[in-house]
Amino acid sequence: MAREKFERNKPHVNIGTIGHVDHGKTTLTAAITNVLAKKGQAEKQDYADIDGAPEERERGITINTAHVEYETDTRHYAHVDCPGHADYVKNMITGAAQMDGAILVCAATDGPMAQTKEHILLAKQVGVPALVVALNKCDMVDDEEIIELVEMEVRELLDSYDFPGDDIPVVQVSGLKALEGEAEWEAKIEELMAAVDEAIPEPEREVDKPFLMAVEDVFSITGRGTVATGRIERGKVKVGEEIEIVGIKDARKTTVTGVEMFRKLLEEGMAGDNCGLLLRGIQKEDIERGMVLVKPGSITPHTKFEGEVYVLKKEEGGRHTPFFAGYRPQFYIRTTDVTGQITAFTADDGSAVEMVMPGDRIKMTGELICPVAMENGMRFAIREGGRTIGAGVVSKIIE
């Protein structure tokens, strides 16, 4: 049977459900697909379909994630839901599931709990731009005042992590009752999705961002010059444009004199393309793997940064023993390993710790031996002798 063509007539947005264990994230996800399926905008999925998500590997880390897709009247959504708390931490830090926004699920019966806080903090640190709150299990709370108190508590919590607590929509839902087909609760799911359509901004497309390509390989072509190959991460580049080479050595500018893909010459390369760029006046030894080609001035090289890191457990192929401040691993950034040092660290909530155990999540300060093009939200892996022992995301650039 011929595959259906993916219709790109609606803007695409990536979202996910986050929140404390057993507050009903997966049930709510199932309810969304069931309610939208009645309008022909989704395929119905039940709790078991979503809960039995297969394992995936991202940067050498095993993560369980369920992916569902659905549409509203105005948008196409890809929605991720994770069964376990550890899966969320790994997912958000590795960027396996980049979220343009998230539905924070909080049970009205419990109010905000430990992981509610942790997921809000994680969302802030890894740069999830917008949230919508689903107060779930509202069918189980008879007293409207209790629901209002929980709502106030959630809003204050969001404020304390620098989300606009007063402005974020909070919708009272019951995932279970909506799944069971009760009309008033189905209407609440529609209200929730209308809030998501409204409050989660449409992401800027990769192709509209400033050009960036990480260099994977370099060739010199006799009589023509030097070609750098790689995958264009974002933006686009045209023949004749000036670009900058950033990282490892001093930054320098050059002009793109050719764009080549599958041995064909192109006028321009775009985000997602694997291509070669012919660079004017550049020698093969001027450029190496680990550098990036960028729109001039759009990104700068740095050596010192703070990051959020998940350290792999022994069972995940990580270290068997703890490490201490002063530990010197390799940081795998885009296409290359750069040696660096973890000069300091704390537990993820900022409390002091003496050492880092496999399976921990930490905030760390790192210092690289040579500058690398870096920006907030950039992902990296921490490696030791070629095997991944941790995954991280840059939360703040120091110098």
Curated annotation (Swiss-Prot):
GO CC annotations, alphabetized:
cytosol
Q: Which residues are listed for Mg(2+) binding in this entry? A: T26
In alphabetical order, the GO MF annotations are: GTP binding; GTPase activity; translation elongation factor activity
InterPro entries in the record: EF-Tu_GTP-bd, EF-Tu_GTPase, EFTu-like_2, EFTU_2, G_TR_CS, P-loop_NTPase, Small_GTP-bd, T_Tr_GTP-bd_dom
Region feature G4, mapped onto this chain: 136-139
EC number from the UniProt entry: 3.6.5.3
Q: Where is this region: G2?
A: 60-64
Q: Where is this region: G1?
A: 19-26
Which reaction(s) does its UniProt entry say it catalyses? Answer: GTP + H2O = GDP + phosphate + H(+)
Q: Where is the tr-type G domain positioned along the sequence?
A: 10-204
Major localisation = cytoplasm
- Which residues are involved in binding GTP? 19-26, 81-85, 136-139
**Region called G3, residue ranges:** 81-84
The protein's superkingdom reads Bacteria
Compartment annotation = Cytoplasm
Q: What PROSITE patterns does the record tag this protein with?
A: G_TR_1 (PS00301), G_TR_2 (PS51722)
What are the UniProt keywords, alphabetically? Answer: Cytoplasm, Elongation factor, GTP-binding, Hydrolase, Magnesium, Metal-binding, Nucleotide-binding, Protein biosynthesis
What are the start and end residues of every segment in region (G5)?
174-176
- Describe the function of this protein: GTP hydrolase that promotes the GTP-dependent binding of aminoacyl-tRNA to the A-site of ribosomes during protein biosynthesis.
Q: Which PANTHER family match?
A: ELONGATION FACTOR TU, MITOCHONDRIAL, ELONGATION FACTOR TU-RELATED
Tell me how this protein assembles: Monomer.
Family to which this protein belongs:
Belongs to the TRAFAC class translation factor GTPase superfamily. Classic translation factor GTPase family. EF-Tu/EF-1A subfamily.
Q: Return the protein name.
A: Elongation factor Tu
What is the protein's species of origin?
Parasynechococcus marenigrum (strain WH8102)
What is the gene name? tuf
